[in-house]
Amino acid sequence: MMKQIQVDLGERSYPIYIGQNLMNDSEALSRYLLKKRILIVTNETVAPLYLNQIQEVMVSFGEVESVILPDGEQFKDLAHLDAIFTALLQRNYGRDSVLVALGGGVIGDMTGFAAACYQRGIDFIQIPTTLLSQVDSSVGGKTAVNHPLGKNMIGAFYQPQLVLIDTQCLHTLPAREFAAGMAEVIKYGIMWDGKFFQWLENNVQALKRLETEALVYAISRCCEIKADVVSQDETEQGVRALLNLGHTFGHAIEAEMGYGNWLHGEAVAAGTVLAAQTARSLGLIDESIVCRIVQLLQAFDLPVSAPESMDFDSFIQHMRRDKKVLGGQIRLVLPTGIGQADVFSQVTESTLEQVICCA
């Protein structure tokens, strides 16, 4: 069972393939890799699990080499980006080469940014191995590295040639990482598709058991939504901003606690609850909607409150650096119901302080 979704961006359009054991499907990969020099970028966790397997498939297309980076958000920086450039330069890779991102969101973001920059742009494909990267970061062309003063502050919009999603990878994913990915899955239901949110409420156990049919449906629905949004607004000038539900608060948590201490999805989960509580305080939603959001996040063992060590001042200093800030105004994506959200720029700091201090 393989599902195909198209991201429509004119001449930069590309497919997303979703199914089980797709990493062994040479036909799906051949169009993008035949007679190419291939550099696989992966990390120390994923390499022992899947690097040999994917190399054996790709070696029939051309020369295949790899670079293995440390695993973790704390390594998503310029120093480790440079390791990719060094590998490309030392091995004389040209513009006809292809980078392959084999890993989670960190590997995908860094590989994509390296592809965007190297010789002013070379092809890359995404083979995401975590749920979070499968449903979110591998689709849409956002690539970046972190800076000590902010997450994803140095990057580019650069689309892959292909996204290949193999649900079998989720069977080797730690439970905490799977839960973190579910935060992004739930986000899609809150900000775009109320029926999908209800489906998630009714299929918690099937997803936690990693049932293939449930996984393929959930991942496909997320990718359909992401593809639709990106096709309308590739560079986040409008509707794409809705995909940042929970992220302004979440990025503040990640930055304050130190990248890697809270997983991105965990921070987004807590941030989504804060966004819902802010919406409730503004009269946009009622308490019953906040409760549904909290209960679904808790069903997947996700945090629903910020770290106790974080106060309003620590939140606001990071939120003021958020990429969505315009004219000095913090802009928040807030739910206006289950299945809908909007961007608000007139939320006062006193309102935020009340929400954060009472959370």
UniProtKB/Swiss-Prot annotation:
Keyword Lyase set for record: yes
UniProt record, GO biological process: amino acid biosynthetic process; aromatic amino acid family biosynthetic process; chorismate biosynthetic process
Protein residues bound to NAD(+): 71-76, 105-109, 129-130, 142, 151, 169-172
Cofactor(s) listed in the protein's UniProt record: Co(2+); Zn(2+); NAD(+)
GO terms, molecular function: 3-dehydroquinate synthase activity; metal ion binding; nucleotide binding
Family annotation (InterPro entries): Dehydroquinate_synthase, DHQ_synth_AroB, DHQ_synth_fam, DHQS/DOIS_N, DHQS_C
Entry's localization field: Cytoplasm
Enzyme Commission number(s) from the entry: 4.2.3.4
Disulfide bond residue pairs: none
Record pathway: Metabolic intermediate biosynthesis; chorismate biosynthesis; chorismate from D-erythrose 4-phosphate and phosphoenolpyruvate: step 2/7
Residues binding Zn(2+): 184, 247, 264
Keyword set, alphabetical order: Amino-acid biosynthesis, Aromatic amino acid biosynthesis, Cobalt, Cytoplasm, Lyase, Metal-binding, NAD, Nucleotide-binding, Zinc
GO cellular component: cytoplasm
Reactions catalysed: 7-phospho-2-dehydro-3-deoxy-D-arabino-heptonate = 3-dehydroquinate + phosphate
PANTHER family membership: 3-DEHYDROQUINATE SYNTHASE, 3-DEHYDROQUINATE SYNTHASE, CHLOROPLASTIC
The protein's name in its UniProt record: 3-dehydroquinate synthase
Organism this protein belongs to: Shewanella sp. (strain W3-18-1)
Gene for this chain: aroB
